[in-house]
């Protein structure tokens, strides 16, 4: 679980990187679709799945908007993400293993874009946050 220190670290990092959330989301989603091509099946209705395409940028922005919302509601991730969990479980039918794959890509991009801020301590707290976020998104699958 997230300690008070983890929560403070995540909030402090988000305060620094939040203004570039759209860029982080687009890059992370583009990477996921490239490195893990099996994830493309969920987006087959998009005309262009290549990194940097309009749909990838748009959904990357949507994803990071939800991440920002989760950061602001870090004390109740299950409650904060309940509607998204329901959407992904019952309507979109996304395999919850993909939440961890996307989270990994977001972490990679944060490390690339903010190497000075992404210390091992920050990495650990951010990783724990995304593990908890993925778990909260998986809540409706149980």
UniProtKB/Swiss-Prot annotation:
Residues 1-142 form the Globin domain. Red blood cells. The keyword Protein transport does not apply. One of its GO terms (biological process) is hydrogen peroxide catabolic process. Heme b binds at residue 88. The modification N-acetylserine is found at residue 1. The keyword Iron applies. Keywords: Acetylation, Heme, Iron, Metal-binding, Oxygen transport, Transport. O2 binds at residue 59. GO terms for cellular component: blood microparticle; haptoglobin-hemoglobin complex; hemoglobin complex. Gene3D superfamilies: Globins. It comes from the Eukaryota. One of its GO terms (molecular function) is oxygen carrier activity. InterPro entries: Globin, Globin-like_sf, Globin/Proto, Hemoglobin_a-typ, Hemoglobin_oxygen_transport, Hemoglobin_pi. Involved in oxygen transport from gills to the various peripheral tissues. Heterotetramer of two alpha chains and two beta chains. Belongs to the globin family. This is Hemoglobin subunit alpha. The gene is hba.
């Amino acid at each position: 679980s997230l300690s008070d220190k983890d929560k403070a670290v995540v909030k402090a990092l988000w305060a620094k990187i939040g203004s570039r959330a759209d860029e982080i989301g687009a890059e992370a989603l583009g990477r996921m679709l490239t490195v893990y091509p099996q994830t493309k099946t969920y987006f087959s209705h998009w005309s262009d799945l290549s990194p940097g395409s309009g749909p990838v940028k748009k959904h990357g922005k949507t994803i990071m908007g939800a991440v920002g919302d989760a950061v602001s509601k870090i004390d109740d991730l299950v409650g904060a993400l309940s509607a998204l969990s329901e959407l992904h479980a019952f309507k979109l039918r996304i395999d919850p293993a993909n939440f961890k794959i996307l989270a990994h890509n977001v972490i990679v991009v944060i490390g690339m874009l903010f190497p000075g801020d992404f210390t091992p301590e920050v990495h650990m707290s951010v990783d724990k946050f995304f593990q908890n976020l993925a778990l909260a998104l998986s809540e409706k699958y149980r």
